């Protein structure tokens, strides 16, 4: 698969990161991460992407992205961990791990929420047993093509415009940079550079071979 060669793609993070990191980014109003660090992974290969990987991101406590009003003011520093290649969180019950090939596990103080794009499961703490699921929330989101056309016609931002999708993509690819550079990346999003790891520079601003410029 072409996605699994560094010369052409970004592996699982480059392929699925923007889909699954989208859920916490959208739900919690996240922007660019403060750091990215590989918790566990295979040996690095110069040409091919890792078949499995665990990456931990840190985000600021203040909502740096599109703030979600219901969350603003109480969200503390947040840690987000990415798993792929069959790796799953130890907190995930075995019966659910067997049924869910992919998803996002939100871990809170009173329970956990396992979510995908079409289903979710609430894992309650005993003290949280009386919680009632909210009614479906109204949403302005429409099909991809339709909201793109609406943005063109009305001039209003699309749900995944560059202001949102830029930091999201940045986060996904930063995990790859941390893996390839072999160090925790303290990230300067404004200047798109690693503050602490010179080895990361070549994976952030790459000089491509001649013959591929427009």
Model-derived features with residue positions:
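Aromatic-enriched alpha-helical interface/lid elements that frame and gate functional surfaces
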Residues: 103, 107-146
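Short, glycine-/Ser/Thr-/acidic-enriched flexible segments
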Residues: 60-62, 86-87, 111-113, 118-121, ...
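A structural signal for well-ordered alpha-helical segments within the folded catalytic domains
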Residues: 11-14, 18-25, 142-146, 163-173
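Phosphate/diphosphate-binding loops
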Residues: 78-88, 95
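Predominantly a Rossmann-like dinucleotide-binding segment in NAD(P)-dependent oxidoreductases
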Residues: 1-38, 44-47, 55, 61-74, ...
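Short beta-strand scaffold segments in enzyme catalytic cores
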Residues: 53-57, 104-106
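Short, contiguous acidic/charged loop-to-helix segments that flank catalytic cores in large enzymes
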Residues: 43-46, 95-97, 128-140, 152, ...
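C-terminal helix-rich "cap/oligomerization" subdomain common to oxidoreductases
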Residues: 47-48, 151-214
